[in-house]
Amino acid sequence: MKTVLITGANGNLGSAVTKEFLDKGYRVVATVIAETMKADFAANPNLDVQVVDLGNETATAAFILSLIEKYKTIDAALLLVGGFAIGNLSSTTGTDIQKQIALNFETAYHVTQPLFQHMMENKNGRIVFIGTRPALEASQGKNLIAYGLSKSLLFKLAEYLNEEARGKNITATVVAPSTLDTPLNRKSMPDTDPAIWVKPAALAEILEFIVSDKNAPIRESVIKVYNNV
């Protein structure tokens, strides 16, 4: 049985991804930020819910080492923790950018740095980041400056990881969705047809494919999932 780490597992996307991987027979280690969030998950013998502050580099490194000791091999990580901020250049401060980098990049990097070394030793592993269309297209990101800049770092990190892992069965992939069909997005954009958005369950299936053996021959570091947006 493969063991996967899913961060931000109780969010709209995280819940769908956790369900998809459990349904496909994986052992899932799911992270949340508070003890009370454990109640969001139904009991499952293949689910291990852990509370960890991924913004704390020392605590995250210790957490990853404890997982390796417990499960011996971590086959994949899906790093879903993140957050959104609106603001164009004139309204975005350096502090705004730093906050978004801490949330969208550092939480992923703190996991990746120790976990990638484990995967390099095993010559096998998958790391999946969640990017965003505004980080790839200026027309989409001009009013999301801090958010787009913070997410753009994930694309470069994936490039570095893939270069270092060249010749090994290790890949880093950034999946860049457009708007997700979530209750919050439906409420904030009531005049938009949600049929054009990306369903979390559909994105979860794509993430499972990326991690699975079916994806072994593919070396594509960026996958765009825009639906009809």
Model-derived regions: residue spans:
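Substrate-binding pocket helix/loop in short-chain dehydrogenase/reductase
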Residues: N88-S90, D96-I101
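C-terminal helical subdomain
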Residues: G167-I170, V174-V175, T182, D191-V229
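Catalytic loop of short-chain dehydrogenase/reductase
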Residues: R126-R166
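Active-site loop of short-chain dehydrogenase/reductase
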Residues: T73-I74, M119-T132, G167-T171, S221
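Rossmann-fold cofactor-recognition segment
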Residues: A43-T58
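N-terminal Rossmann NAD(P)H-binding glycine-rich loop of SDR-like oxidoreductase domains
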Residues: N10, G14-T18
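Conserved NAD(P)H cofactor-binding loop of Rossmann-fold oxidoreductase domains
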Residues: L78-G87
